[in-house]
Amino acid sequence: MEFILSVVGSLLLVICVLVSVAFLTLLERKVLGYIQIRKGPNKVGLMGIPQPFCDAIKLFTKEQTYPLLSNYLSYYISPIFSLFLSLIVWMCMPFFVKLYSFNLGGLFFLCCTSLGVYTVMVAGWSSNSNYALLGGLRAVAQTISYEVSLALIGFKILLFSLL
């Protein structure tokens, strides 16, 4: 019974995160509309609330294109794996009801966020383009340099919370 509740809680968390991201993009588009002195996406439905769902339908019905010489499977699996990793990170966050509580949650967070950058490199490599590969390697180098400072800040917070 506890396993079923944790699975239902995890699915509910993932759905809430995805819907909140959709409405944050709606908020971003409205703010950009006000900044640029134009009408934002508030023409669909009541105050533009159905706009994220219309955007999702549009994205799912678009034609899929891929580079001619690319490695098709890894080219399309890497963004899916990146989304999966970013949703898994939410599972270790401490909420009111603990979904998955374990002692090394901070280390799990750092590991999942560090794995996310390699999906960009795999996507660049699988496109068989030198420029995409260089972009992927540049993203890996940049993210690794930021992860060191993130880990040091996290360990500093952990150290001061134990004192």
Curated annotation (Swiss-Prot):
Q: Where in the cell is it found?
A: Mitochondrion inner membrane
Which BP terms from GO are recorded? aerobic respiration
InterPro entries named among the record's database cross-references: NADH_UbQ_OxRdtase_su1/FPO (IPR001694), NADH_UbQ_OxRdtase_su1_CS (IPR018086)
- Which Pfam families would you find in this protein's record? NADHdh (PF00146)
Keywords in alphabetical order: Electron transport, Membrane, Mitochondrion, Mitochondrion inner membrane, NAD, Respiratory chain, Translocase, Transmembrane, Transmembrane helix, Transport, Ubiquinone
Membrane topology, record value:
Multi-pass membrane protein
- Catalytic EC class: translocase
| GO MF assignments | NADH dehydrogenase (ubiquinone) activity
The catalysed reaction is: a ubiquinone + NADH + 5 H(+)(in) = a ubiquinol + NAD(+) + 4 H(+)(out)
Would you indicate the residue range of the signal peptide? none
What are the TM regions of this chain, as residue ranges?
3-23, 77-97, 104-124, 143-163
Please state the protein's primary subcellular location.
Answer: mitochondrion
A GO CC annotation recorded here is: mitochondrial inner membrane
Q: What is its EC number?
A: 7.1.1.2
UniProt lists the family membership as follows: Belongs to the complex I subunit 1 family.
Annotated function: Core subunit of the mitochondrial membrane respiratory chain NADH dehydrogenase (Complex I) that is believed to belong to the minimal assembly required for catalysis. Complex I functions in the transfer of electrons from NADH to the respiratory chain. The immediate electron acceptor for the enzyme is believed to be ubiquinone.
Q: In its UniProt entry, what is this protein called?
A: NADH-ubiquinone oxidoreductase chain 1
Taxonomic path:
Eukaryota, Metazoa, Ecdysozoa, Arthropoda, Hexapoda
